[in-house]
A protein has these predicted regions:
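Von Willebrand factor
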Residues: 25-127, 131-137, 155-165
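Conserved Walker B catalytic segment
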Residues: 49, 138-145
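Negatively charged sequence features
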Residues: 1-29
Length: 168
């Protein structure tokens, strides 16, 4: 999926907002997380993730040297994580093992995982089709505190565009 000029500008602006939250990014090596909802078709992921990462790399020197975590969210009980160079995730071979899994998932379970295992990440991009469910809005707000709400950027793929939602 090719990003439009508007989507590119929105992405850059939102990422800058996240990185400039007081106490978040201090100028050293950036640690970031890319969470992909396995409900997305393989072709969409294979096109969109590299486009997003290359856009960020072109945007700022901060993304030249990144500790990159790639997480595939398959179900509430199945989440796979890889630590790799960010540029590896821009190659088509990186997605050879990707398999689409449309299962019912709870947003709260993903947030709980991120709270426990990805607390060091200064930027968390979540690429989804929006098919997850939210069972308890209060629980979501609670899990967003103290840090997830300042670091999480939800990117929802629709048929022809990318919706960027800054979750505070």
């Amino acid at each position: 999926m090719k990003l439009s000029l508007t989507e590119t500008k929105q992405l850059k602006n939102r990422v800058e907002q996240i990185l400039h939250v007081p106490g978040n990014y201090t100028g050293k090596i950036l640690e970031m997380e890319m969470v992909v909802d396995a409900a997305l078709p393989k072709e969409t992921v294979k096109e969109t993730v590299p486009e997003l990462l290359l856009t960020l790399k072109r945007h700022s020197k901060v993304f030249q040297n990144v500790r990159f975590n790639y997480t595939l969210w398959m179900s509430d009980w199945r989440i796979e994580n890889k630590v790799c160079p960010m540029m590896l995730a821009t190659t088509s071979g990186f997605y050879e093992d990707y398999r689409e899994e449309k299962t019912e998932k709870s947003y709260e379970s993903l947030l709980e995982y991120l709270q426990k295992f990805q607390a060091r990440s200064k930027l968390i991009l979540f690429l989804t089709d929006g098919s997850y469910r939210i069972e308890d809005e209060d629980a979501v707000q609670e899990k967003m505190q103290p840090f997830l709400g300042k670091k999480l950027l939800v990117l929802t793929v629709t048929e022809d565009r990318l919706e960027i939602d800054y979750r505070r």
